[in-house]
């Protein structure tokens, strides 16, 4: 009886672990393409002008994000992306600070497993 080759086992584990990671890497990449200073400015402008609460501001952010995503990648890739998001709950989420009644978006967490993209990290 032969023992399993440790290299093969490690490779199998790596392949299994990489699949969702590669999709998350794609999510970060797409989010960085979509989230710009202009995008953040528009969200913050909406928050101030319409005096949105956090739930409304998050909804506004996601609607704008999805519209830009659909425009950027086309419907086929968009459908795969949103299907993955629904399954794993990995929609990008805005991070707000409350300044005495008005919200400011200071960053985005692309998924629950990925790092935050801060407003000041974006190219103007």
UniProtKB/Swiss-Prot annotation:
A motif (DLNP) lies at residues 121-124. It comes from the Viruses. It is found in: Host mitochondrion. GO terms for cellular component: host cell mitochondrion. The keyword Hydrolase does not apply. InterPro entries: RSV_NS2. Keywords: Host mitochondrion, Host-virus interaction, Inhibition of host innate immune response by virus, Inhibition of host interferon signaling pathway by virus, Inhibition of host IRF3 by virus, Inhibition of host IRF7 by virus, Inhibition of host RIG-I by virus, Inhibition of host RLR pathway by virus, Inhibition of host STAT2 by virus, Inhibition of host TBK1 by virus, Inhibition of host TLR pathway by virus, Interferon antiviral system evasion, Modulation of host cell apoptosis by virus, Viral immunoevasion. It holds the Pfam family RSV_NS2. GO terms for biological process: symbiont-mediated perturbation of host apoptosis; symbiont-mediated suppression of host cytoplasmic pattern recognition receptor signaling pathway via inhibition of IRF3 activity; symbiont-mediated suppression of host cytoplasmic pattern recognition receptor signaling pathway via inhibition of IRF7 activity; symbiont-mediated suppression of host cytoplasmic pattern recognition receptor signaling pathway via inhibition of RIG-I activity; symbiont-mediated suppression of host cytoplasmic pattern recognition receptor signaling pathway via inhibition of TBK1 activity; symbiont-mediated suppression of host JAK-STAT cascade via inhibition of STAT2 activity; symbiont-mediated suppression of host toll-like receptor signaling pathway; symbiont-mediated suppression of host type I interferon-mediated signaling pathway. Its main location: host cell. Belongs to the pneumovirus non-structural protein 2 family. Monomer (instable). Homomultimer. Heteromultimer with NS1. Interacts with host RIGI (via N-terminus); this interaction prevents host signaling pathway involved in interferon production. Interacts with host MAP1B/microtubule-associated protein 1B. Plays a major role in antagonizing the type I IFN-mediated antiviral response. Acts cooperatively with NS1 to repress activation and nuclear translocation of host IFN-regulatory factor IRF3. Interacts with the host cytoplasmic sensor of viral nucleic acids RIGI and prevents the interaction with its downstream partner MAVS. Together with NS2, participates in the proteasomal degradation of host STAT2, IRF3, IRF7, TBK1 and RIGI through a NS-degradasome involving CUL2 and Elongin-C. The degradasome requires an intact mitochondrial MAVS. Induces host SOCS1 expression. The DNLP motif has IFN suppressive functions like binding to host MAP1B. This is Non-structural protein 2. The lineage of its organism: Viruses, Riboviria, Orthornavirae, Negarnaviricota, Haploviricotina.
């Amino acid at each position: 009886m032969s023992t399993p080759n440790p290299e093969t086992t490690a490779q199998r584990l790596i392949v299994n672990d990489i699949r969702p990671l590669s999709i998350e890497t794609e999510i970060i990449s797409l989010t960085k393409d979509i989230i710009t200073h202009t995008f953040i400015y528009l969200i913050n402008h909406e928050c101030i002008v319409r005096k949105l609460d956090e739930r409304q501001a998050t909804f506004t952010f996601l609607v704008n994000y999805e519209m830009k995503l659909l425009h950027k990648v086309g419907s086929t890739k968009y459908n795969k992306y949103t299907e993955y998001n629904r399954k794993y709950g990995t929609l990008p989420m805005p991070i707000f600070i409350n300044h005495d009644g008005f919200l400011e978006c200071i960053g985005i967490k692309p998924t629950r497993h990925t790092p935050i993209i801060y407003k000041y990290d974006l190219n103007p």
